[in-house]
């Protein structure tokens, strides 16, 4: 039995579990080769919490990414890349296109995920996948090429993170200069998707491209719902 060969990463739990079913897989469990494909579906509840909390009436992008990336994690675990039970799973990068918003009446999202290649460097494994997400009638939603890494706890502890710049550090340390409330007209997310406490600095022409830069802050609640829901 597959579960006797080691511990593998599991999918997030509610309210961030975004796989309703896996319809098919083209190969047996533990097979690590390019071309392995899985088809998964997520039933979109018309009254889902994120439609209300997101304030736009559409599925928030943070939720959509879970819908399309969780099948990637499932396929990587199914393929046996983490059977040692000693590795952590991280999404690394991606390049894709979003074709449309997902709305309450759309029914379901079907994601076809294909393992394209993998690479091992010491205890690290990098897995590359391509996916297409559509509605039940085939209407395109997202196409994406992305990669994931399996890392040891020691490797994650020594990671350097994103390289900062003097300009970024100066912006981080700059005094508060919040926008005038009369200048803000867009609705903000609420409840579970209310993920900042305050916007304390706004530069309309800031940033590398001159198109604006904003600084938000949130006091991290160790009991926040997303810690338990998303792997932890």
Question: What kind of region is each of these model predictions?
Answer:
Residues 1-4, 72-116, 143, 149:
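Hydrophobic beta-strand-centered segment that forms part of the acyl-chain substrate-binding groove
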């Amino acid at each position: 039995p597959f579960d006797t060969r080691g511990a593998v990463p599991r999918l997030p739990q509610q309210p961030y579990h975004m796989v309703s079913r896996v319809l098919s897989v083209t190969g047996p469990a533990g097979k690590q080769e390019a071309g392995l494909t899985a088809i998964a579906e997520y039933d979109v509840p018309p009254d889902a919490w994120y439609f209300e909390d997101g304030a736009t009436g559409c599925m928030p992008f943070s939720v959509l990414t879970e819908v399309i990336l969780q099948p990637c994690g499932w396929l990587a675990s199914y393929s046996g890349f983490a059977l040692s039970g000693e590795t952590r799973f991280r999404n690394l990068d991606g390049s894709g296109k979003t074709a449309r918003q997902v709305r309450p009446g759309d029914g379901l999202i079907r994601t076809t995920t294909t393992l394209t290649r993998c690479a091992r460097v010491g205890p690290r494994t990098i897995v590359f996948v391509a996916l297409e997400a559509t509605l039940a009638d085939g209407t395109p939603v997202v196409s994406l090429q992305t990669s994931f890494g399996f890392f040891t706890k020691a490797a994650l502890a020594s990671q350097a993170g994103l390289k900062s710049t003097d300009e970024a550090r100066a912006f981080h340390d700059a005094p508060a200069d919040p926008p005038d409330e009369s200048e803000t007209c867009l609705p903000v997310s609420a409840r579970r998707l209310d993920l900042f406490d305050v916007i304390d600095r706004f530069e309309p022409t800031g940033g590398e491209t001159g198109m604006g830069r904003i600084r938000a802050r949130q006091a991290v609640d160790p009991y926040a719902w997303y810690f338990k829901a998303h792997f932890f």
